[in-house]
Amino acid sequence: MGSRTLLGHLSVLAVVLLLLLQGTQSVDIKYQGYQVQLESVKKLKALEEQWVSSPRLQAQDPQPAVCHHPALPLDLQPICTSQEAASILQALRTMDNDECELCVNIACTGC
């Protein structure tokens, strides 16, 4: 009887571990030498919708305003150092989330 209980606990533990591993898989987007997570692109869109930077800062700085947001995901920060940051971030924003989550878009990996 003790071995059945142990076997039952191990089975439950295995199922829990599988569910946790499945939840940690992420879809990555590779674009112009940068690799970012789809979740980061979703957060980028949300940050841009909520943040309005000062017009003076926009006039002085060639970087997109969102690059100065303290909550910008770490994997997007290297893009902000590029001279093409605005166009790269724009391209990432326009990638359809559904296409990446379904792995239709060739730039998306990790499905």
UniProtKB/Swiss-Prot annotation:
Gene3D superfamilies: Guanylin. One of its GO terms (cellular component) is extracellular region. SUPFAM superfamilies: Proguanylin. Residues 1-26 form the signal peptide. Keywords: Disulfide bond, Secreted, Signal. It comes from the Eukaryota. Disulfide bonds join 67-80, 100-108, 103-111. It is found in: Secreted. Residues 27-96 form a propeptide. InterPro entries: Guanylin, Guanylin_sf. GO terms for molecular function: guanylate cyclase activator activity. Belongs to the guanylin family. Endogenous activator of intestinal guanylate cyclase. It stimulates this enzyme through the same receptor binding region as the heat-stable enterotoxins. May be a potent physiological regulator of intestinal fluid and electrolyte transport. May be an autocrine/paracrine regulator of intestinal salt and water transport. This is Guanylate cyclase activator 2B. It comes from Cavia porcellus (Guinea pig). The gene is GUCA2B.
